[in-house]
């Protein structure tokens, strides 16, 4: 987030050419990115009304191996990619499927399915209970003389990778059906053959400037047809071309853009980052993210995960006084040591000695500055909880609509900051739960809020109770003292 806020966008230009061969059109991009408008104009002028020449052609077949069986981390990341489902929700659903005997134990780090689980028996049950109308999908696998799923590298001595039991499903909700279907199709795809694609790359010389066109086509779907619709390849084609062959340039155009800051994390790639930094385990990482959201240290919207003011303050305060405690190196070292203890490679006593040595100075520093640290966090926590600017007051146009928590009722509501100055009595009720963020201004002049609840998606509402965009303008009661929803 610090890198994002410090990013200064620089203008860049992309140049694209539209080429033609025997009535077939395709696009190619200038290989280099241009950083000033004068060079852009120079290239456009140099390429205008010119013919291109095929400078180089690269073709090769690309083999795509089947996916590995799911461990809990892979399942969480895949469910987020496909369904935008949070890791915590995915894990909770997987546990419910396990308790219903529909899948194996989900809290596993293994990517290996041992023969002892009974490949054939599971496939037979899946065919009978889930593929009655399309038995050929499973029959093609069962016809093989030797059944062997594609295995991953990660092992868990306690549990195999996640797999479906094949038992007939009972009454499931929509999310449970989605996760179960994903697990079933992932299991089937591990028995699939390699997929094969044909990759083509053509370099075109236009008056000394080089454009690159790419194409990708499927030669053999292999395991992909077993995993559909959860994986697909965008196919594109190029006409038949030869090196040194002239080619018609139909159009050359430039588009201006700006350099972008690093993308914010989402819950899936944050899991990857935590894994690479050695923070948490496959079973605890989703819970850690969920806890940070619950405590309002971070929040997630459609743009990704962002730290709140409270989260930033805690980070900066701890970094200032006890940076060792928030070091990922210390956390990673501790997680590694715990794993060694589980595997019998380290004694608990040795870990205790290490921790006493590593944490001695940080703990002393913390105790020495405990009062200062507490006051800094307390101040921002009070500000964060009791006051948040939402936008201009629609009534007086002078004050700010701020989020206030009533000291008497403990309920929160919006009120004009000019109340004590001018007596402006503009107020609006807000939901008593959920993370609130301003979205935009409604046609009625009042703010539209973006609100996220635990395990629910974001939704929006105008805070003006008589506006048609207010989700609560019908059949809800308001507290007369605070004007808050009851």
Provide a role label for each language-model segment.
Residues 106:
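Short Lys/Arg-enriched helix C-cap and helix-to-coil transition segments
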Residues 1-95, 100-102, 259, 276:
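Conserved phosphate-chemistry cores used by DNA topoisomerases
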Residues 4-6, 87-88, 109-486:
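Basic, low-complexity terminal or inter-domain segments flanking catalytic cores
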């Amino acid at each position: 987030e610090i890198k994002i806020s410090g990013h200064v966008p620089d203008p860049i230009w992309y140049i694209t050419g539209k080429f033609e061969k025997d009535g077939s059109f395709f696009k190619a991009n200038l290989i280099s990115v241009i950083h000033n408008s004068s060079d852009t104009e120079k290239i456009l002028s140099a390429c205008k009304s010119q013919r291109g020449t095929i400078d180089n052609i690269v073709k090769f077949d690309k083999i795509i191996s089947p996916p590995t069986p799911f461990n809990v981390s892979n399942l969480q990341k895949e469910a987020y990619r496909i369904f935008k489902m949070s890791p915590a929700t995915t894990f909770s659903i997987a546990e419910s499927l396990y308790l219903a005997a529909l899948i194996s134990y989900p809290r596993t780090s293994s990517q290996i399915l041992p023969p002892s689980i009974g490949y054939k028996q599971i496939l037979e049950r899946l065919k009978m209970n889930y593929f009655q109308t399309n038995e050929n999908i499973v029959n093609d696998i069962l016809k093989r003389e030797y059944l062997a799923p594609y295995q991953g590298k990660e092992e868990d001595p306690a549990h195999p990778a996640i797999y479906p039991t094949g038992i007939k499903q009972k009454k499931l909700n929509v999310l449970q059906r989605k996760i179960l279907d994903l697990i079933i199709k992932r299991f089937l795809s591990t028995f699939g053959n390699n997929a094969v694609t044909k990759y083509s790359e053509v370099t075109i010389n236009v008056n000394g400037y080089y454009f690159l066109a790419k194409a990708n086509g499927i030669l053999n779907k292999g395991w992909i047809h077993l995993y559909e619709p959860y994986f697909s390849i965008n196919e594109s084609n190029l006409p038949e071309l030869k090196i040194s062959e002239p080619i018609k340039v139909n159009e050359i155009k430039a588009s201006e853009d700006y350099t972008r800051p690093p993308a914010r994390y989402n819950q899936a790639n944050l899991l990857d980052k935590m894994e690479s930094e050695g923070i948490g385990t496959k079973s605890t990482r989703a819970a850690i993210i969920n806890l940070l959201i619950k405590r309002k240290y971070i929040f997630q919207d459609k743009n990704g995960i962002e730290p709140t003011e409270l989260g930033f303050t805690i980070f900066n305060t701890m970094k200032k006084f006890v940076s060792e405690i928030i070091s990922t190196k210390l956390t990673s070292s501790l997680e590694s040591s715990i794993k060694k203890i589980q595997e019998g490679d380290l004694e608990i006593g040795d870990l205790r000695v290490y921790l006493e040595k590593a944490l001695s100075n940080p703990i002393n520093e913390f105790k020495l500055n405990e009062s200062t640290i507490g006051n800094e966090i307390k101040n921002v926590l009070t500000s964060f909880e009791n006051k948040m600017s939402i936008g201009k007051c629609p009534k007086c146009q002078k004050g700010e609509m701020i989020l206030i928590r009533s000291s008497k009722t403990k309920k929160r509501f919006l009120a004009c900051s000019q109340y004590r100055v001018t007596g402006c009595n503009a107020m609006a009720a807000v939901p008593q739960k959920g993370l609130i963020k301003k979205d935009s201004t409604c046609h009625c002049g009042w703010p539209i809020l973006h609100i996220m609840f635990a395990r629910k998606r974001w939704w929006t509402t105008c805070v003006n109770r008589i506006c048609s965009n207010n989700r609560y303008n019908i059949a809800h009661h308001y507290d007369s003292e605070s004007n808050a929803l009851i």
